[in-house]
Amino acid sequence: MKFEKLVPSVFYTNLKDSFKLFTDCLEFAIGHDETSAENAFCVMEKDGLSMLLFQNKEYAEKVYPEFRLVTKDIEAVYKKVSATHPELLHPNLNKVTLRPWGAKEFAIKDEQVCFIIQEWP
C-alpha cells in the first residue's frame, strides 16, 4: 500500500471560529472554500499539509482532536506565536519544554482543537 497524505477533519460549531488559529496564527490558506454552503466546510493548506474543517455543532460538541506539527525550529515558531497570538497558548504547555521522550514541545489551542508543536533532536 502507498498513501500520499493524511487529511484529518476538525468540526466547529461556527466554522469562522477556526480562522484565528488556522489562517492568522498558523498561516494556513483556504485551498477550497465552501464556507457559505448549507453544510459549510473548507480545506486549509500549508506546506503540503491539508485539513478539512467542517461546521457541524453535533460533532463539534463530541470531538476535541489533538494533532502534532513537527518543525526544525521550534524556538522561531514559539517566538512568533507567543508574540502574535499569546491567547492561543495552551495553559498546560505554554512554553517550549523538553519532554521526557526527547522532543521539545509547546501547545496551542482554540475551543475545538489542540496542536502540539514539536522539534525532535
Regions found by a protein language model. Name each.
Residues M1-E4, Y59-Y64, P100:
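Short glycine-enriched loop/turn motifs at secondary-structure junctions
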Residues M1-F19, F67, P121:
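N-terminal beta-strand motif that seeds the catalytic metal site of vicinal oxygen chelate
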Residues V10-S50:
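Core segments of cupin and vicinal oxygen chelate
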Residues T13-L15, F67-C114:
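Vicinal oxygen chelate
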Residues S36-A40, E61, R99-K104:
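Short acidic/glycine-enriched loop/turn segments that link adjacent beta-strands
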Residues D47-M51, E58-A60, I74-V77:
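Short, charged/polar surface micro-motifs in flexible loops or helix N-caps
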Residues M51-F54, A107, F115-Q118:
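Conserved beta-strand in the GNAT
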Residues N56, L93-R99, E119-P121:
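Acetyl-CoA-dependent GNAT
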